[in-house]
C-alpha cells in the first residue's frame, strides 16, 4: 500500500506562536485495519511520520481518529478552521488599531517618552503590532486546511517574526512587572538619601539612570527574543506532504546525535519554559512583593476624598485602605490575565512534549484536544496582543483624555487651534490626598511622591506613569 493512496488530506496544528508543526494527525478506520495487518503499510506510515519529525501512534494512518465520524468529523473540523480564521482577522484588526493608537499617543506626548516605564509600554505596543501583522498569513493557512500558499521564503520570515514577537511580548510584560516594583523601591531609597542632605541631584540622577537602564534592557530583550527564535529562522521550511505544501518546523535527523523527535520536543520545551513558566514566576513574585510592600508600609496620615480623618498613630486611613484594595485588585488582574491567556495553550504544548519524549502514550483524547481545543487556545493566546493596549493604556485617565482630544481634533479639524492637543495630565480624582506611599515624614519632601503599583510622580509636573489597573 502506498501512503499517497490515502484520500483524506493532512492536518497540521499550529502552536501559540503560529509557527511550528504540533502534530500531523490522520487516522481513518479503513487504513487503520490495513496498518495493523500489513507490516509494509506500517513501515511506510512510520517513515512519513518520522520524515515530519513526529512519532506515529500505534495503529495510526492518515485520515480521522480511530472510531471517528468520517465525513461528519471532516465537516466539523472545517467549520472550526473557518471560525479560527475569522477570529484571527478580528484579533488582527483590533490589535492593529489598538497598538497603533498607543504608539501614536506615546509619540505625541513628549513628557511621557521621558518615562522609563513608558519605554516598555511603547516597545510592548510595537511588538504586539508586529505580531498581529503575521495573523493574516496564519488565517489564510487555517482556511486552506493548513496548506501554505506563500512560498518557502515567507514561511521562514513569517515563522521567525511570529516567534520573535511572541517572546518579546512576554519578555516586555515581565520587565514591566519588575519595573513596577523597582520604581517604588528606588523612589524610597532616593527619598532617604535626600533626607541625609544629598540634594535633588540624587533624584535627577536616579531618573536618568533608570531611563538609560531601561533602554539597555529593551535592547537586551529584543536580542534575547531574536536568539530564542533562531530555530524558526533555521528550521522553518515548506515540505510537500500528500501533494500539499505545508509550512512547518523540520529538524534534521540525528542532529548532534539526537533524532527529530528529541529536537521537536526540546523546541516545545523552550517555548513553555521561556514563554510561560519563567515569566509567570517572575511576574507573580514581583507583584506579591509589591502587595506585601503596600501592606507593610506605614502610610502618611491623610484625609480621604470625603474628608474623613486618617487613622491615628500612623495607620492606614480609609482612603489609603481603599487605595491598597485597588492595587490588590490590579495585581490580581495582572497575574490572572497572563495565566488565563497562556495556560490552555501551554498545557496542551506540555502534553505534546510528554508524548514526544515518550513519557505518556499517544491517545485519541490527545488527538481530539489538538483538533478542537488547541485552535481555541491559540486564539486565546493571540488575543493577548489586542488586550494589552486596553489593559495597559486606555484604562488610565490621561490616556483616555488624550484619546478624547485626538477624536475631538479629528471630528472638528477647523477648531483645532482653539483646543490644542496637550500633554496635561492629572492624577485620578480618587487619588487626591492618598497618592503617596511614603515614610511618615515624607510630607517634608514634596518634590517626590510615590504610590503603588510603582509609579513615581514628581510634584513639579512630571509623571512616571503606569496604569494602576493595568494587566501583566
Curated annotation (Swiss-Prot):
Endpoints of the signal sequence: none
Cystine connections: 155-247
Extracellular side: 1-81, 141-156, 237-270, 320-332
GO MF term list: G protein-coupled peptide receptor activity
UniProt entry tagged with the keyword Transmembrane helix: yes
A GO biological-process term: phospholipase C-activating G protein-coupled receptor signaling pathway
Domain of life of the source: Eukaryota
List of glycosylated residues: 36, 40
Record membrane topology: Multi-pass membrane protein
One annotated Gene Ontology cellular component of this protein: plasma membrane
Presence of the UniProt keyword Membrane in the record: yes
Residues passing through the membrane, by range: 82-102, 120-140, 157-177, 216-236, 271-291, 299-319, 333-353
PROSITE patterns in alphabetical order: G_PROTEIN_RECEP_F1_2 (PS50262)
Cytoplasmic side: 103-119, 178-215, 292-298, 354-472
Keywords: Cell membrane, Disulfide bond, G-protein coupled receptor, Glycoprotein, Membrane, Receptor, Transducer, Transmembrane, Transmembrane helix
Compartments where located: Cell membrane
InterPro entries named among the record's database cross-references: CCR1-9-like, GPCR_Rhodpsn, GPCR_Rhodpsn_7TM
Protein purpose: Receptor for RNL3/relaxin-3. Binding of the ligand inhibit cAMP accumulation.
PANTHER family in alphabetical order: CELL ADHESION MOLECULE, RELAXIN FAMILY PEPTIDE_INSL5 RECEPTOR 4
Family of the protein in this entry: Belongs to the G-protein coupled receptor 1 family.
Listed name of the protein: Relaxin-3 receptor 1
Organism, scientific name: Mus musculus
Lineage: Eukaryota, Metazoa, Chordata, Craniata, Vertebrata
Amino acid at each position: 500500500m502506498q501512503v499517497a493512496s490515502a484520500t483524506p488530506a493532512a492536518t497540521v496544528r499550529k502552536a501559540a506562536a503560529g509557527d511550528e508543526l504540533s502534530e500531523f494527525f490522520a487516522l481513518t478506520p479503513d487504513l487503520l485495519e490495513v496498518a495493523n495487518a500489513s507490516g509494509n503499510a506500517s513501515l511506510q506510515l512510520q517513515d512519513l511520520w518520522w520524515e515530519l519529525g513526529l512519532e506515529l501512534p500505534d495503529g495510526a494512518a492518515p485520515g480521522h481518529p480511530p472510531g471517528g465520524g468520517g465525513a461528519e468529523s471532516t465537516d466539523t473540523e472545517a467549520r472550526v478552521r473557518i471560525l479560527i480564521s475569522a477570529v484571527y482577522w478580528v484579533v488582527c484588526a483590533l490589535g492593529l488599531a489598538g497598538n497603533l493608537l498607543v504608539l501614536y499617543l506615546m509619540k505625541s506626548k513628549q513628557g511621557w517618552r521621558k518615562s522609563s516605564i513608558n519605554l516598555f509600554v511603547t516597545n510592548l505596543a510595537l511588538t504586539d503590532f508586529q505580531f498581529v501583522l503575521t495573523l493574516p498569513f496564519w488565517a489564510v493557512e487555517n482556511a486552506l486546511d493548513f496548506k501554505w500558499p506563500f512560498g518557502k521564503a515567507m514561511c521562514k520570515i513569517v515563522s521567525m517574526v511570529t516567534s520573535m514577537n511572541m517572546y518579546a511580548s512576554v519578555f516586555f510584560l515581565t520587565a514591566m512587572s519588575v519595573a513596577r516594583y523597582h520604581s517604588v523601591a528606588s523612589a524610597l531609597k532616593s527619598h532617604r538619601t535626600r533626607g541625609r542632605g544629598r540634594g535633588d541631584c540624587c533624584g535627577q540622577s536616579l531618573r536618568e539612570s533608570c531611563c538609560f537602564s531601561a533602554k539597555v534592557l529593551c535592547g537586551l530583550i529584543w536580542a534575547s527574543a531574536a536568539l530564542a527564535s533562531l530555530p524558526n529562522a533555521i528550521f522553518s521550511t515548506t515540505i510537500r506532504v500528500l501533494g500539499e505544501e505545508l509550512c512547518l518546523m523540520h529538524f534534521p535527523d540525528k542532529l548532534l546525535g539526537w533524532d527529530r523527535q528529541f529536537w521537536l520536543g526540546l523546541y516545545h520545551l523552550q517555548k513553555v519554559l521561556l514563554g510561560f513558566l519563567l515569566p509567570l514566576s517572575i511576574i507573580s513574585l514581583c507583584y506579591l512583593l509589591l502587595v506585601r510592600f503596600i501592606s507593610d508600609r506605614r502610610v502618611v496620615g491623610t484625609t480621604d476624598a470625603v474628608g474623613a480623618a486618617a487613622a491615628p498613630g500612623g495607620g492606614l486611613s480609609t482612603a489609603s485602605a481603599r487605595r491598597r484594595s485597588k492595587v490588590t485588585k490590579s495585581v490580581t488582574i495582572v497575574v490572572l490575565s497572563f495565566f488565563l491567556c497562556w495556560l490552555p495553550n501551554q498545557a496542551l504544548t506540555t502534553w505534546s512534549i510528554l508524548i514526544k519524549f515518550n513519557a505518556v502514550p499517544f491517545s485519541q483524547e490527545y488527538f481530539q484536544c489538538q483538533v478542537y481545543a488547541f485552535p481555541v487556545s491559540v486564539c486565546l493566546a493571540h488575543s493577548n496582543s489586542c488586550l494589552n493596549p486596553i489593559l495597559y493604556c486606555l484604562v488610565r485617565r490621561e490616556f483616555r483624555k488624550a484619546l478624547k482630544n485626538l477624536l475631538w481634533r479629528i471630528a472638528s479639524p477647523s477648531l483645532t487651534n482653539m483646543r490644542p492637543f496637550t500633554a496635561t495630565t492629572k492624577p485620578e480624582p480618587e487619588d487626591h490626598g492618598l497618592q503617596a506611599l511614603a515614610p511618615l515624614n515624607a510630607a517634608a519632601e514634596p518634590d517626590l511622591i510615590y504610590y503603588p503599583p510603582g509609579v513615581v510622580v514628581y510634584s513639579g509636573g512630571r509623571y512616571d506613569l503606569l496604569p494602576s489597573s493595568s494587566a501583566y
